[in-house]
Amino acid sequence: VKELFNSLVELGQHPKEMADTVTVMEKIGHFLDDEVTDLYQECKNNGLSKREASPVIAEKLPVAKILKRASKGWDGGYAMAGLFGHGVAFVLRDPSGIRPAFWYEDDEVCVVASERPVIQTAFRLKYDQVKELTPGSALIIKKSGKVSELKINEPRELKSCSFERIYFSRGNDYDIYAERKNLGKLVVDQVLKAVDYDLDNSVFSFIPNTAETSFYGMIKGLEDYLNDKKYQAILDLGANPAPEQLQEIIYQRARIEKIAIKDAKLRTFITQDDARDDLVAHVYDITYGSVVRGKDN
């Protein structure tokens, strides 16, 4: 922010405060003024009056160029939406794709949101009908209704926000759901090592509620591990295994319980740090009897 603030001062601007929103708006405003001034001078040279020049400037105003010049030097994640006075709206996404952005257009509306499922649900759409805004690009919506996605900045290495995808995003997104399930499968080896492969005395659950999808993936991974273990155990029994031995092997499964119960009306995430620990004690409760005290992992 300080770097952007100083660059504005060097350009002759006087931002009212050193805040990211203010400096970004001032930056866009500065280059907007530049382009308007140049276009007005062109109109004036062609003998147009101020009244006659206004619609010409509105029509020729290079929004993509303004965004490119203004966003030079920006870093971090953003999906920035704005509306110019002559009726052109835009959404600009960061080149690394840190912040998500999706859009949909038909003959009536153009909508942009940070999550695909909200657009799918609101407009009853299929997965492939909603487009992802390309990192470094801007969606520009003109007053006439024309919509175009234009490259503003060169895309960089994709660095999607892990907090956004793993914790905060809606779990019913096609990609997010698959990603969270896969994450659960990937931790299975570490979980098994942590409980010393003792599934008989280990109880598996999840917390917080957003971990549920990953939990399903972890259980699938545990089931795969158990199936391989059962298969080998049955082979080791030989040609004529006793029914009791087969039954003991086949009925082995991971112990799954709903251990932690959360009050849906309370949220720890938005709580001040100094009050969060106290609030957690009231937000979460335990299902008594689901764990054998002093024995279960």
Regions found by a protein language model. Give the residues of each.
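Internal hydrophobic scaffold segments of catalytic domains
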Residues: 139, 212-213, 259
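Short, solvent-exposed polar/charged micro-motifs at secondary-structure junctions
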Residues: 28-29, 89-92, 213-216, 265-271
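Terminal amphipathic helices with adjacent charged low-complexity linkers/tails
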Residues: 145-161, 206-240
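Conserved helix-loop functional segments at active or binding sites
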Residues: 189, 193, 220, 224, ...
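Conserved short alpha-helical segments that host acidic/polar catalytic motifs at enzyme active sites
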Residues: 2-134, 140-202, 207-208, 293
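Short, glycine/charge-rich flexible loops or terminal/linker lids adjacent to PRPP-binding catalytic cores
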Residues: 223-297
